[in-house]
UniProtKB/Swiss-Prot annotation:
Pathway(s): Cofactor biosynthesis; molybdopterin biosynthesis
SUPFAM superfamilies: Radical SAM enzymes (SSF102114)
Tissue spec. comment: Expressed in all organs, with an abundant expression in the roots.
Residue range of the transit peptide in the UniProt record, numbered on this chain: 1-45
Name listed for the protein in its UniProt record: GTP 3',8-cyclase, mitochondrial
EC number(s) recorded for this UniProt protein: 4.1.99.22
Positions with a binding annotation for S-adenosyl-L-methionine: 91, 132, 183, 254
Species this protein is from: Arabidopsis thaliana
The encoding gene: CNX2
Length: 390
């Protein structure tokens, strides 16, 4: 298999946009020698991640509830606000739809804020709102306002399909929304309708432009690559970064209940990178943050950037700092793990903050070192993505 490799030119542990890893490509019979072995590379990562954790603890002392048995510090909470969505994306929701949790069983606004406050007081500094589609929740503006007011929270983000975002974004920004990711898997309107089973491509493009006009930089665009569906648009997506502050994020197709995952649909990172390198040979690897899930790149002359999220072929479990609170109040420590624990039930039974912290901490301590291989993941019972929120 043709692979693209990286050579470290600056091992500075601090994150700076000017620190790059040069990219070479193995194409055809030619090859590029990897300058750092996998073992050495893993040691460098482990060392930088450990150093990052020490800095984090010094800057913001955390409770033990956020540290798992492998020493990973979890400072990033993803909150699913709803299971409802105004699209029916093929990789996210089964064609027949999903059974929605009755509204009384979903977390209320006050419950979301209380639980989020527990995490932030313990050391979480970033919260991302997901769904379903988070913007279909009527009280999203008030939720953003209350969450952004939590002392210690540094970043409030949202992942959205962009269908209704353009008209809501000005107010969401006023309510403290710091950053956003917009999901878009094709630049072709007809293909958009096929992939999402709905119309609305023009509205998503408008939302991207609105975000740029409001000063969001970068505006992150999530693109799930699926063989035979949109892998012919990879370089077209990269072109979006030429004149606009857009960070295009190519995501490997992941298996979840109901999305008919097939390894043949998976376009691995190395293959995507080969296509990009051939078209944009000046692409350069940026120095990534120790807990970054993406491999980040810039291209000479481009205003934006390109990233790759390699959950299937090159997982990033060693530096995982993410936790998930689902719309029904279940707490999930791994995107690909089936294990969940309810925080809603003890909350509604009158549990105090200390009791809730104990439940959270115990779940975090049970987190595994890494998720299973992609073929095993495909066989594991898990929720549809629409229920998890990514």
């Amino acid at each position: 298999m043709r692979r693209c490799f990286s050579k470290i030119t600056d091992c500075h542990l601090g994150f700076k946009n000017s620190n790059f890893l040069l990219v070479g490509s193995e194409v055809g019979s030619g090859s590029v020698t990897r300058t750092i072995t996998t073992t050495t590379s893993e040691r460098l990562f482990s060392s930088s991640y450990a150093a990052h954790q020490v800095d984090q603890i010094k800057d913001n002392p955390v409770s033990d509830m956020l540290i798992d048995k492998f020493g990973r510090l979890h400072t990033y909470l993803r909150i699913s606000l709803t299971e409802r969505c105004n699209l029916r994306c093929q990789y996210c929701m089964p064609s027949e739809g999903v059974e929605l949790t009755p509204k009384p069983q979903l977390l209320s606004q006050s419950e979301i804020v209380r639980l989020a406050g527990l995490f932030v007081s313990a050391g979480v500094n970033k919260i991302r709102l997901t769904g379903g589609e988070p913007t279909v929740r009527k009280d999203i503006e008030e939720i953003c306002l209350q969450l952004s007011s939590l002392k210690g929270l540094k970043n409030l983000a949202i992942t959205t399909n962009g269908i209704t975002l353009a008209k809501k974004l000005p107010r969401l920004k006023e309510c403290g929304l710091d950053s956003l990711n917009i999901s878009l898997d094709t630049l072709v309107p007809a293909k958009f309708e096929f992939l999402t089973r709905r119309k609305g491509h023009d509205r998503v493009m408008k939302s991207i432009d609105t975000a740029i006009e409001l000063g969001y930089n970068p505006v992150k665009v999530n693109c799930v690559i699926m063989r035979g569906l949109n892998d012919d648009e990879i370089c077209d997506f990269v072109e979006l970064t030429r004149d606009k502050p857009i960070n295009v994020r190519f995501i490997e197709f992941m298996p979840f209940d109901g999305n008919v995952w097939n390894v043949k649909k998976l376009v691995p990172y190395a293959e995507v990178m080969d296509k990009v390198v051939k078209r944009f040979p000046s692409i350069k690897r940026m120095q990534d943050h120790p807990t970054e899930t993406a491999k980040n790149f810039t291209i000479d002359g481009h205003c934006g950037s390109v990233s790759f999220i390699t959950s299937m072929t090159e997982h990033f479990c060693a530096g995982c700092n993410r936790l998930r609170l689902l719309a029904d109040g279940n707490f999930k420590v791994c995107l690909f793990g089936p294990s969940e624990v309810s925080l809603r039930d003890p909350l509604r039974s009158g549990a105090d903050d200390e009791a809730l912290r104990e439940i959270i901490g115990a779940a975090v301590k049970r987190k595994k070192a890494a998720h299973a291989g992609m073929l095993d993941i495909a066989k594991t019972a898990n929720r549809p993505m629409i229920h998890i929120g990514g």
